[in-house]
Curated annotation (Swiss-Prot):
Residues 1-22 form the signal peptide. This is Uncharacterized lipoprotein MPN_097. The lineage of its organism: Bacteria, Bacillati, Mycoplasmatota, Mycoplasmoidales, Mycoplasmoidaceae. Keywords: Cell membrane, Lipoprotein, Membrane, Palmitate, Signal. A lipid is attached at C23 (N-palmitoyl cysteine).
Protein backbone atom coordinates (compact mmCIF):
# COMPACT_ATOMS: atom_id res chain seq x y z
CA UNK A 1 0.00 0.00 0.00
CA UNK A 2 2.80 2.42 0.82
CA UNK A 3 4.49 1.63 -2.46
CA UNK A 4 1.35 2.31 -4.42
CA UNK A 5 0.67 5.75 -3.03
CA UNK A 6 4.30 6.67 -2.62
CA UNK A 7 4.91 6.18 -6.32
CA UNK A 8 1.61 7.73 -7.26
CA UNK A 9 2.21 11.03 -5.60
CA UNK A 10 5.57 11.75 -7.10
CA UNK A 11 4.58 10.64 -10.53
CA UNK A 12 1.50 12.78 -10.04
CA UNK A 13 3.65 15.88 -9.85
CA UNK A 14 5.34 14.81 -13.07
CA UNK A 15 2.14 14.04 -14.88
CA UNK A 16 0.53 10.99 -16.38
CA UNK A 17 2.77 8.51 -18.07
CA UNK A 18 2.69 6.06 -20.92
CA UNK A 19 3.56 2.45 -20.13
CA UNK A 20 4.26 -0.07 -22.86
CA UNK A 21 3.47 -3.74 -22.65
CA UNK A 22 5.62 -6.13 -24.67
CA UNK A 23 5.86 -9.75 -25.56
CA UNK A 24 8.43 -11.62 -23.89
CA UNK A 25 10.05 -14.40 -19.56
CA UNK A 26 8.08 -15.24 -16.45
CA UNK A 27 4.48 -15.24 -17.55
CA UNK A 28 5.35 -13.60 -20.84
CA UNK A 29 3.06 -13.98 -23.80
CA UNK A 30 2.93 -12.71 -27.37
CA UNK A 31 0.11 -10.39 -28.36
CA UNK A 32 -1.61 -10.82 -31.71
CA UNK A 33 -0.30 -8.37 -34.31
CA UNK A 34 -3.51 -6.68 -35.42
CA UNK A 35 -1.82 -3.87 -37.33
CA UNK A 36 -2.61 -1.08 -34.84
CA UNK A 37 -1.42 0.38 -31.56
CA UNK A 38 -4.05 0.25 -28.84
CA UNK A 39 -3.81 3.07 -26.31
CA UNK A 40 -5.76 2.48 -23.08
CA UNK A 41 -7.24 5.54 -21.40
CA UNK A 42 -9.23 5.81 -18.17
CA UNK A 43 -9.58 9.60 -18.20
CA UNK A 44 -12.80 10.67 -16.50
CA UNK A 45 -12.83 14.26 -17.74
CA UNK A 46 -14.80 14.71 -20.95
CA UNK A 47 -12.64 17.62 -22.05
CA UNK A 48 -9.44 15.66 -21.42
CA UNK A 49 -10.80 12.64 -23.31
CA UNK A 50 -11.85 14.86 -26.21
CA UNK A 51 -8.41 16.47 -26.31
CA UNK A 52 -6.72 13.05 -26.38
CA UNK A 53 -9.01 11.96 -29.21
CA UNK A 54 -8.05 15.06 -31.23
CA UNK A 55 -4.34 14.32 -30.75
CA UNK A 56 -4.78 10.71 -31.87
CA UNK A 57 -6.83 11.77 -34.90
CA UNK A 58 -4.13 14.26 -35.88
CA UNK A 59 -1.40 11.63 -35.52
CA UNK A 60 -3.29 9.13 -37.65
CA UNK A 61 -3.58 11.74 -40.41
CA UNK A 62 0.11 12.67 -40.52
CA UNK A 63 1.77 9.33 -39.64
CA UNK A 64 3.99 7.50 -42.08
CA UNK A 65 2.50 5.01 -44.51
CA UNK A 66 4.14 2.07 -42.79
CA UNK A 67 3.39 3.26 -39.24
CA UNK A 68 0.55 1.66 -37.30
CA UNK A 69 -2.48 3.84 -36.54
CA UNK A 70 -3.42 4.46 -32.91
CA UNK A 71 -6.76 3.35 -31.50
CA UNK A 72 -8.05 4.46 -28.09
CA UNK A 73 -9.42 1.80 -25.73
CA UNK A 74 -11.57 3.39 -23.03
CA UNK A 75 -11.46 1.87 -19.54
CA UNK A 76 -13.97 2.78 -16.84
CA UNK A 77 -13.07 3.54 -13.25
CA UNK A 78 -10.35 6.16 -13.53
CA UNK A 79 -6.71 5.31 -12.89
CA UNK A 80 -7.56 2.59 -10.35
CA UNK A 81 -9.88 1.04 -12.92
CA UNK A 82 -7.05 1.10 -15.46
CA UNK A 83 -4.74 -0.59 -12.97
CA UNK A 84 -7.22 -3.36 -12.22
CA UNK A 85 -7.93 -3.92 -15.91
CA UNK A 86 -4.23 -4.21 -16.75
CA UNK A 87 -3.59 -6.64 -13.88
CA UNK A 88 -6.47 -8.83 -15.02
CA UNK A 89 -5.42 -8.93 -18.67
CA UNK A 90 -1.81 -9.75 -17.75
CA UNK A 91 -2.84 -12.53 -15.37
CA UNK A 92 -5.13 -14.23 -17.93
CA UNK A 93 -2.64 -13.68 -20.77
CA UNK A 94 -5.07 -11.77 -22.97
CA UNK A 95 -3.41 -12.02 -26.40
CA UNK A 96 -6.14 -10.53 -28.59
CA UNK A 97 -7.76 -7.52 -26.89
CA UNK A 98 -4.90 -6.41 -24.62
CA UNK A 99 -3.63 -2.91 -25.37
CA UNK A 100 -0.06 -1.81 -26.09
CA UNK A 101 0.11 1.46 -24.14
CA UNK A 102 -1.76 2.89 -21.16
CA UNK A 103 -2.14 6.32 -19.59
CA UNK A 104 -1.53 5.77 -15.90
CA UNK A 105 0.98 6.18 -13.12
CA UNK A 106 4.41 4.58 -13.65
CA UNK A 107 4.22 2.13 -10.74
CA UNK A 108 2.22 -0.01 -13.19
CA UNK A 109 5.55 -0.79 -14.79
CA UNK A 110 6.32 -2.95 -11.74
CA UNK A 111 3.15 -4.96 -12.42
CA UNK A 112 4.31 -5.56 -15.98
CA UNK A 113 7.85 -6.31 -14.80
CA UNK A 114 6.66 -9.17 -12.57
CA UNK A 115 5.54 -10.88 -15.77
CA UNK A 116 8.42 -9.74 -17.96
CA UNK A 117 6.09 -7.52 -20.00
CA UNK A 118 7.76 -4.15 -19.45
CA UNK A 119 9.20 -2.46 -22.52
CA UNK A 120 11.71 0.43 -22.36
CA UNK A 121 11.33 3.47 -24.59
CA UNK A 122 14.65 2.81 -26.31
CA UNK A 123 15.12 5.07 -29.30
CA UNK A 124 12.45 7.58 -28.20
CA UNK A 125 13.78 11.14 -28.32
CA UNK A 126 13.36 12.73 -24.89
CA UNK A 127 15.70 15.68 -25.47
CA UNK A 128 12.89 18.20 -24.93
CA UNK A 129 12.15 16.80 -21.46
CA UNK A 130 14.16 17.83 -18.42
CA UNK A 131 16.08 14.86 -16.97
CA UNK A 132 14.36 15.64 -13.66
CA UNK A 133 11.03 14.69 -15.23
CA UNK A 134 12.38 11.22 -16.04
CA UNK A 135 14.14 10.40 -12.77
CA UNK A 136 11.11 8.55 -11.42
CA UNK A 137 12.11 5.69 -13.74
CA UNK A 138 15.10 5.11 -11.44
CA UNK A 139 12.70 4.37 -8.58
CA UNK A 140 10.62 1.72 -10.36
CA UNK A 141 11.33 -1.65 -8.77
CA UNK A 142 11.49 -5.06 -10.42
CA UNK A 143 12.60 -3.97 -13.90
CA UNK A 144 15.26 -5.91 -15.78
CA UNK A 145 17.49 -2.90 -16.45
CA UNK A 146 17.63 0.84 -15.93
CA UNK A 147 15.77 2.62 -18.72
CA UNK A 148 12.87 4.95 -19.45
CA UNK A 149 9.78 2.78 -19.10
CA UNK A 150 7.37 5.69 -18.71
CA UNK A 151 7.29 9.18 -20.17
CA UNK A 152 5.27 12.10 -18.72
CA UNK A 153 2.78 13.49 -21.21
CA UNK A 154 0.51 15.68 -19.07
CA UNK A 155 1.96 17.75 -16.27
CA UNK A 156 0.42 19.40 -13.24
CA UNK A 157 1.54 20.16 -9.72
CA UNK A 158 0.04 21.21 -6.43
CA UNK A 159 0.04 24.95 -5.80
CA UNK A 160 -0.70 27.16 -2.79
CA UNK A 161 -3.28 29.90 -3.43
CA UNK A 162 -3.76 32.67 -0.87
CA UNK A 163 -6.97 34.61 -0.24
CA UNK A 164 -5.51 38.10 0.20
CA UNK A 165 -8.63 39.80 1.69
CA UNK A 166 -8.97 37.08 4.35
CA UNK A 167 -5.25 37.14 5.12
CA UNK A 168 -5.36 40.92 5.41
CA UNK A 169 -8.15 40.76 7.96
CA UNK A 170 -6.34 38.04 9.94
CA UNK A 171 -2.98 39.82 10.00
CA UNK A 172 -4.40 43.31 10.44
CA UNK A 173 -6.48 42.12 13.40
CA UNK A 174 -3.54 40.40 15.06
CA UNK A 175 -0.75 42.93 14.50
CA UNK A 176 0.31 45.75 16.80
CA UNK A 177 -0.80 49.28 16.08
CA UNK A 178 1.87 50.98 13.99
CA UNK A 179 4.04 53.09 16.28
CA UNK A 180 1.99 52.17 19.33
CA UNK A 181 3.57 50.46 22.33
CA UNK A 182 0.25 49.52 23.88
CA UNK A 183 -0.34 45.80 24.09
CA UNK A 184 -4.10 45.87 23.69
CA UNK A 185 -6.68 48.32 22.43
CA UNK A 186 -10.29 47.50 23.20
CA UNK A 187 -13.37 48.68 21.36
CA UNK A 188 -16.97 47.61 21.14
CA UNK A 189 -18.06 45.99 17.88
CA UNK A 190 -21.61 45.85 16.54
CA UNK A 191 -22.26 42.48 18.15
CA UNK A 192 -21.18 43.86 21.56
CA UNK A 193 -18.16 41.57 21.69
CA UNK A 194 -14.87 43.03 22.84
CA UNK A 195 -12.50 43.59 19.97
CA UNK A 196 -8.89 43.05 21.02
CA UNK A 197 -5.94 44.53 19.17
CA UNK A 198 -3.13 42.04 18.89
CA UNK A 199 0.57 41.92 19.65
CA UNK A 200 1.73 40.21 16.47
CA UNK A 201 4.51 41.80 14.46
CA UNK A 202 5.06 41.67 10.71
CA UNK A 203 8.61 40.92 9.62
CA UNK A 204 10.75 43.62 8.06
CA UNK A 205 12.64 41.46 5.56
CA UNK A 206 12.17 42.29 1.88
CA UNK A 207 10.06 39.23 1.02
CA UNK A 208 7.65 39.85 3.88
CA UNK A 209 7.32 43.57 3.09
CA UNK A 210 6.54 42.76 -0.54
CA UNK A 211 3.98 40.11 0.40
CA UNK A 212 2.28 42.39 2.94
CA UNK A 213 2.16 45.18 0.37
CA UNK A 214 0.48 42.85 -2.14
CA UNK A 215 -2.01 41.66 0.48
CA UNK A 216 -2.91 45.25 1.39
CA UNK A 217 -3.38 46.13 -2.26
CA UNK A 218 -5.68 43.17 -2.93
CA UNK A 219 -7.70 43.87 0.22
CA UNK A 220 -8.15 47.46 -0.93
CA UNK A 221 -9.39 46.30 -4.31
CA UNK A 222 -11.77 43.89 -2.61
CA UNK A 223 -13.19 46.63 -0.40
CA UNK A 224 -13.73 48.95 -3.35
CA UNK A 225 -15.32 46.45 -5.69
CA UNK A 226 -17.11 43.84 -3.61
CA UNK A 227 -20.10 43.81 -1.30
CA UNK A 228 -22.38 41.02 -0.25
CA UNK A 229 -26.09 41.56 -0.62
CA UNK A 230 -28.62 39.72 1.47
CA UNK A 231 -32.30 39.43 0.96
CA UNK A 232 -34.75 38.73 3.76
CA UNK A 233 -37.26 36.09 2.83
CA UNK A 234 -40.79 35.78 4.08
CA UNK A 235 -41.41 33.11 6.68
CA UNK A 236 -41.52 29.59 5.22
CA UNK A 237 -40.66 30.97 1.81
CA UNK A 238 -37.68 29.58 -0.05
CA UNK A 239 -35.87 32.35 -1.83
CA UNK A 240 -32.27 32.62 -2.88
CA UNK A 241 -29.67 35.27 -2.22
CA UNK A 242 -27.13 36.30 -4.79
CA UNK A 243 -23.63 37.25 -3.71
CA UNK A 244 -22.99 40.02 -6.19
CA UNK A 245 -20.41 42.68 -6.96
CA UNK A 246 -21.14 46.39 -6.91
CA UNK A 247 -19.02 49.52 -6.89
CA UNK A 248 -18.23 51.19 -3.58
CA UNK A 249 -17.30 54.84 -3.12
CA UNK A 250 -14.22 54.01 -1.07
CA UNK A 251 -10.77 55.33 -1.71
CA UNK A 252 -7.24 54.71 -0.46
CA UNK A 253 -6.92 52.64 2.72
CA UNK A 254 -10.68 52.81 3.22
CA UNK A 255 -10.95 50.02 0.66
CA UNK A 256 -9.01 47.63 2.90
CA UNK A 257 -11.09 48.77 5.89
CA UNK A 258 -14.31 48.02 4.03
CA UNK A 259 -12.91 44.63 3.06
CA UNK A 260 -12.04 43.86 6.70
CA UNK A 261 -15.55 44.78 7.83
CA UNK A 262 -17.06 42.30 5.40
CA UNK A 263 -14.58 39.54 6.21
CA UNK A 264 -15.24 40.06 9.93
CA UNK A 265 -18.92 39.25 9.39
CA UNK A 266 -17.85 35.75 8.38
CA UNK A 267 -14.67 35.17 10.38
CA UNK A 268 -15.72 36.86 13.61
CA UNK A 269 -13.47 38.81 15.96
CA UNK A 270 -9.82 38.12 16.72
CA UNK A 271 -8.84 36.50 20.05
CA UNK A 272 -5.46 37.13 21.68
CA UNK A 273 -4.56 33.66 23.00
CA UNK A 274 -1.44 31.69 23.84
CA UNK A 275 -0.50 29.36 21.01
CA UNK A 276 -2.23 31.70 18.58
CA UNK A 277 -0.85 34.84 16.94
CA UNK A 278 -0.08 36.43 20.30
CA UNK A 279 3.52 37.75 20.26
CA UNK A 280 4.03 35.96 16.93
CA UNK A 281 6.17 37.37 14.14
CA UNK A 282 4.68 36.80 10.71
CA UNK A 283 7.11 36.30 7.84
CA UNK A 284 6.58 35.38 4.21
CA UNK A 285 8.71 32.26 4.62
CA UNK A 286 5.90 30.54 6.57
CA UNK A 287 4.59 29.63 3.12
CA UNK A 288 7.92 28.10 2.09
CA UNK A 289 7.81 25.02 4.33
CA UNK A 290 5.13 22.55 5.35
CA UNK A 291 5.98 22.91 9.04
CA UNK A 292 5.78 26.70 8.87
CA UNK A 293 2.51 26.61 6.93
CA UNK A 294 0.79 24.15 9.27
CA UNK A 295 2.07 25.92 12.39
CA UNK A 296 0.82 29.31 11.14
CA UNK A 297 -2.54 27.77 10.17
CA UNK A 298 -2.94 26.31 13.66
CA UNK A 299 -2.20 29.69 15.25
CA UNK A 300 -4.77 31.40 13.02
CA UNK A 301 -7.43 28.81 13.87
CA UNK A 302 -6.88 29.31 17.60
CA UNK A 303 -7.03 33.09 17.17
CA UNK A 304 -10.53 32.95 15.66
CA UNK A 305 -12.09 30.49 18.05
CA UNK A 306 -15.68 31.76 17.74
CA UNK A 307 -15.79 30.83 14.05
CA UNK A 308 -13.08 28.19 13.69
CA UNK A 309 -11.53 26.34 16.65
CA UNK A 310 -14.61 26.19 18.90
CA UNK A 311 -17.05 25.15 16.16
CA UNK A 312 -17.99 21.46 16.27
CA UNK A 313 -20.41 21.36 13.33
CA UNK A 314 -20.25 23.41 10.15
CA UNK A 315 -22.72 24.27 7.43
CA UNK A 316 -21.71 24.77 3.84
CA UNK A 317 -21.96 28.53 4.36
CA UNK A 318 -19.70 28.62 7.45
CA UNK A 319 -15.94 29.05 7.69
CA UNK A 320 -14.52 25.65 6.72
CA UNK A 321 -11.07 26.12 8.21
CA UNK A 322 -7.83 27.96 7.57
CA UNK A 323 -6.01 25.59 5.20
CA UNK A 324 -7.86 23.60 2.55
CA UNK A 325 -6.50 20.49 0.84
CA UNK A 326 -7.77 18.92 -2.36
CA UNK A 327 -5.57 15.84 -2.02
CA UNK A 328 -4.60 14.55 1.42
CA UNK A 329 -2.24 11.85 0.05
CA UNK A 330 -0.36 14.51 -1.90
CA UNK A 331 -0.10 16.75 1.14
CA UNK A 332 0.94 13.97 3.50
CA UNK A 333 3.56 12.37 1.31
CA UNK A 334 5.13 15.59 0.08
CA UNK A 335 5.34 16.97 3.62
CA UNK A 336 7.04 13.76 4.77
CA UNK A 337 9.34 13.91 1.75
CA UNK A 338 10.23 17.51 2.63
CA UNK A 339 10.85 16.51 6.27
CA UNK A 340 13.41 14.03 4.94
CA UNK A 341 15.34 16.84 3.20
CA UNK A 342 13.76 15.85 -0.15
CA UNK A 343 15.93 12.74 -0.19
CA UNK A 344 14.38 9.49 -1.40
CA UNK A 345 16.69 7.58 0.93
CA UNK A 346 14.68 9.11 3.78
CA UNK A 347 11.28 8.40 2.25
CA UNK A 348 8.84 5.53 2.87
CA UNK A 349 10.76 3.24 0.59
CA UNK A 350 13.83 3.25 -1.58
CA UNK A 351 14.85 1.10 -4.52
CA UNK A 352 17.78 -1.15 -3.68
CA UNK A 353 19.15 -3.68 -6.15
CA UNK A 354 16.04 -3.23 -8.26
CA UNK A 355 13.69 -4.02 -5.38
CA UNK A 356 11.55 -1.85 -3.10
CA UNK A 357 13.18 -1.54 0.32
CA UNK A 358 10.84 -0.59 3.20
CA UNK A 359 13.43 -0.66 5.98
CA UNK A 360 12.98 3.10 6.46
CA UNK A 361 9.55 2.39 7.87
CA UNK A 362 10.93 0.60 10.92
CA UNK A 363 10.18 2.37 14.18
CA UNK A 364 13.71 3.75 14.41
CA UNK A 365 13.94 4.51 10.70
CA UNK A 366 14.17 8.00 9.26
CA UNK A 367 10.85 7.78 7.44
CA UNK A 368 9.04 6.74 10.61
CA UNK A 369 10.49 9.64 12.56
CA UNK A 370 9.70 12.13 9.79
CA UNK A 371 6.13 10.85 9.55
CA UNK A 372 5.75 11.18 13.31
CA UNK A 373 6.83 14.84 13.17
CA UNK A 374 4.47 15.61 10.30
CA UNK A 375 1.60 13.75 11.99
CA UNK A 376 2.00 15.83 15.15
CA UNK A 377 1.88 19.03 13.07
CA UNK A 378 -1.33 17.97 11.33
CA UNK A 379 -2.88 16.75 14.59
CA UNK A 380 -2.53 20.20 16.16
CA UNK A 381 -4.20 21.74 13.11
CA UNK A 382 -7.08 19.25 13.05
CA UNK A 383 -7.59 19.58 16.82
CA UNK A 384 -8.13 23.31 16.28
CA UNK A 385 -10.55 22.71 13.36
CA UNK A 386 -8.17 24.55 11.05
CA UNK A 387 -7.89 21.89 8.32
CA UNK A 388 -10.47 21.42 5.58
CA UNK A 389 -10.21 18.21 3.55
CA UNK A 390 -12.07 18.15 0.25
CA UNK A 391 -14.54 15.30 -0.10
CA UNK A 392 -13.94 15.06 -3.83
CA UNK A 393 -16.03 15.99 -6.83
CA UNK A 394 -15.01 19.62 -6.78
CA UNK A 395 -12.21 22.02 -5.87
CA UNK A 396 -11.48 23.48 -2.45
CA UNK A 397 -11.61 26.86 -4.14
CA UNK A 398 -15.42 26.57 -4.14
CA UNK A 399 -15.09 27.66 -0.51
CA UNK A 400 -11.95 29.76 -0.68
CA UNK A 401 -13.14 32.20 -3.32
CA UNK A 402 -16.09 33.03 -1.05
CA UNK A 403 -13.70 33.76 1.85
CA UNK A 404 -14.41 30.55 3.79
CA UNK A 405 -10.73 29.54 3.79
CA UNK A 406 -7.58 31.61 4.12
CA UNK A 407 -5.65 29.56 1.56
CA UNK A 408 -5.64 26.16 -0.09
CA UNK A 409 -3.37 23.67 -1.83
CA UNK A 410 -4.77 22.09 -4.97
CA UNK A 411 -3.83 20.96 -8.45
CA UNK A 412 -2.69 23.55 -10.95
CA UNK A 413 -5.18 21.96 -13.35
CA UNK A 414 -7.93 23.66 -11.34
CA UNK A 415 -6.20 27.04 -11.12
CA UNK A 416 -8.94 28.82 -13.08
CA UNK A 417 -11.52 27.79 -10.47
CA UNK A 418 -9.70 29.63 -7.68
CA UNK A 419 -11.02 33.07 -8.61
CA UNK A 420 -14.43 34.72 -8.49
CA UNK A 421 -14.81 36.85 -11.59
CA UNK A 422 -17.07 39.84 -12.08
CA UNK A 423 -19.96 37.55 -13.02
CA UNK A 424 -19.34 34.91 -10.34
CA UNK A 425 -22.41 34.30 -8.23
CA UNK A 426 -23.38 31.75 -5.62
CA UNK A 427 -26.91 30.82 -4.68
CA UNK A 428 -27.59 30.86 -0.97
CA UNK A 429 -30.87 29.94 0.75
CA UNK A 430 -32.23 32.33 3.36
CA UNK A 431 -34.37 29.84 5.31
CA UNK A 432 -31.41 28.18 7.06
CA UNK A 433 -30.97 25.68 4.24
CA UNK A 434 -28.05 25.68 1.86
CA UNK A 435 -26.37 23.89 -1.01
CA UNK A 436 -23.61 21.78 0.53
CA UNK A 437 -20.37 22.12 -1.37
CA UNK A 438 -18.80 20.20 -2.95
CA UNK A 439 -21.23 17.27 -2.94
CA UNK A 440 -23.99 19.25 -4.67
CA UNK A 441 -23.20 21.70 -7.43
CA UNK A 442 -25.27 22.54 -10.46
CA UNK A 443 -24.64 24.20 -13.78
CA UNK A 444 -27.12 26.98 -14.53
CA UNK A 445 -28.04 27.13 -18.19
CA UNK A 446 -28.73 30.42 -19.92
CA UNK A 447 -32.29 30.80 -21.23
CA UNK A 448 -32.89 29.95 -24.87
CA UNK A 449 -35.98 29.87 -27.04
CA UNK A 450 -37.00 26.44 -25.79
CA UNK A 451 -36.48 27.29 -22.13
CA UNK A 452 -38.42 30.52 -22.51
CA UNK A 453 -41.35 28.64 -24.02
CA UNK A 454 -41.17 26.12 -21.18
CA UNK A 455 -40.70 28.92 -18.68
CA UNK A 456 -44.37 29.70 -18.40
CA UNK A 457 -47.28 31.36 -20.13
CA UNK A 458 -46.07 34.78 -19.11
CA UNK A 459 -42.91 34.30 -21.17
CA UNK A 460 -44.48 32.65 -24.18
CA UNK A 461 -47.32 35.14 -24.56
CA UNK A 462 -45.35 38.36 -24.01
CA UNK A 463 -41.87 39.72 -24.23
CA UNK A 464 -39.52 38.09 -21.75
CA UNK A 465 -37.68 41.31 -20.86
CA UNK A 466 -34.97 39.25 -19.19
CA UNK A 467 -37.27 37.84 -16.50
CA UNK A 468 -36.08 34.25 -17.01
CA UNK A 469 -32.48 34.16 -15.80
CA UNK A 470 -31.76 30.49 -16.44
CA UNK A 471 -32.52 26.90 -15.49
CA UNK A 472 -30.92 23.95 -13.76
CA UNK A 473 -31.91 20.30 -13.46
CA UNK A 474 -32.32 18.26 -10.30
CA UNK A 475 -30.98 14.72 -10.47
CA UNK A 476 -32.08 12.20 -7.87
CA UNK A 477 -29.45 10.39 -5.82
CA UNK A 478 -28.72 6.81 -6.79
CA UNK A 479 -30.98 4.46 -4.87
CA UNK A 480 -29.79 1.34 -3.12
CA UNK A 481 -30.18 -1.97 -4.88
CA UNK A 482 -32.13 -4.82 -3.33
CA UNK A 483 -28.86 -6.47 -2.35
CA UNK A 484 -27.58 -3.30 -0.70
CA UNK A 485 -30.84 -2.84 1.20
CA UNK A 486 -30.72 -6.44 2.39
CA UNK A 487 -27.12 -6.07 3.57
CA UNK A 488 -28.05 -2.94 5.50
CA UNK A 489 -31.01 -4.67 7.14
CA UNK A 490 -28.96 -7.73 8.01
CA UNK A 491 -26.35 -5.53 9.64
CA UNK A 492 -28.87 -3.46 11.59
CA UNK A 493 -30.93 -6.41 12.78
CA UNK A 494 -27.96 -8.76 13.36
CA UNK A 495 -29.72 -11.84 12.12
CA UNK A 496 -33.20 -10.88 13.25
CA UNK A 497 -36.10 -10.79 10.85
CA UNK A 498 -36.60 -7.33 9.43
CA UNK A 499 -39.80 -5.52 10.41
CA UNK A 500 -40.38 -4.60 6.81
CA UNK A 501 -38.70 -3.62 3.59
CA UNK A 502 -41.07 -1.01 2.20
CA UNK A 503 -38.58 0.40 -0.27
CA UNK A 504 -37.51 -2.88 -1.85
CA UNK A 505 -38.58 -3.11 -5.44
CA UNK A 506 -40.29 0.26 -5.29
CA UNK A 507 -39.43 3.43 -7.09
CA UNK A 508 -36.57 5.18 -5.33
CA UNK A 509 -37.52 8.12 -3.14
CA UNK A 510 -36.85 11.31 -5.00
CA UNK A 511 -36.98 9.78 -8.47
CA UNK A 512 -40.05 11.85 -9.23
CA UNK A 513 -37.66 14.84 -9.33
CA UNK A 514 -35.12 13.13 -11.58
CA UNK A 515 -34.57 15.36 -14.58
CA UNK A 516 -36.88 18.04 -13.14
CA UNK A 517 -36.10 21.54 -14.39
CA UNK A 518 -36.02 24.46 -11.95
CA UNK A 519 -36.57 27.94 -13.43
CA UNK A 520 -34.86 31.04 -12.05
CA UNK A 521 -36.72 34.35 -12.44
CA UNK A 522 -35.66 37.95 -11.89
CA UNK A 523 -38.86 39.99 -11.46
CA UNK A 524 -41.84 37.65 -11.13
CA UNK A 525 -42.83 33.99 -11.29
CA UNK A 526 -45.35 33.03 -14.02
CA UNK A 527 -48.80 31.83 -13.00
CA UNK A 528 -48.14 28.26 -14.12
CA UNK A 529 -45.04 27.96 -11.92
CA UNK A 530 -44.88 27.41 -8.16
CA UNK A 531 -42.39 29.23 -5.95
CA UNK A 532 -40.07 26.79 -4.21
CA UNK A 533 -41.28 23.83 -6.27
CA UNK A 534 -40.24 24.39 -9.86
CA UNK A 535 -39.38 28.10 -9.76
CA UNK A 536 -37.24 30.45 -7.69
CA UNK A 537 -37.32 34.25 -7.60
CA UNK A 538 -33.87 35.85 -7.40
CA UNK A 539 -33.06 39.46 -6.71
CA UNK A 540 -29.67 41.16 -6.69
CA UNK A 541 -28.75 43.30 -3.72
Amino acid sequence: MQFKYGALIFSGFLGLSIVLASCGARGKFDQVDDGKIKLASSLTSRSASAALQKVVEKYNKVKGVNDYPIEITQIAGGYDGGRTDLQTRVSVKDKTSFYNMILNYPDLVSVLARNGMELPFDGVNVDKLSPNFLKFNERISGVAKKANYAIPISMSTDILILNAPVLHYILNSAKKNDGNTKVQVKAQSKDSQTKVKGTMEIGTDESTKNLWSDIQKKAGENGKATTEGTKKAAAKSTHLTLLTKSEQSTQGNNGASESDKKIEETWGTYSEVDGGLKNYTFKADVFDTWHGLIDFSTRVAKSFKNKVSDISTKKGTDIQGVLGLDSTPNALFTSVFAAGDSNFDNFFYKVKDGRADFSNFNENGTSYKNLEKVFNDYKKLTDSNGLFVNKGGSYTSNFQKFHQLAYSISSSSGYAYAFAGENSKRLKFNDDTFIEYPSFTQEIHAPGQSSQKEGGQQQSNSKDNGNLLGTFTIEAAKSKTKTEVKKTEDTQNQGKKAEGTPNQGKKAEGTENQGKTIFLYKTSIPNDKQDGVDAVLIKDK
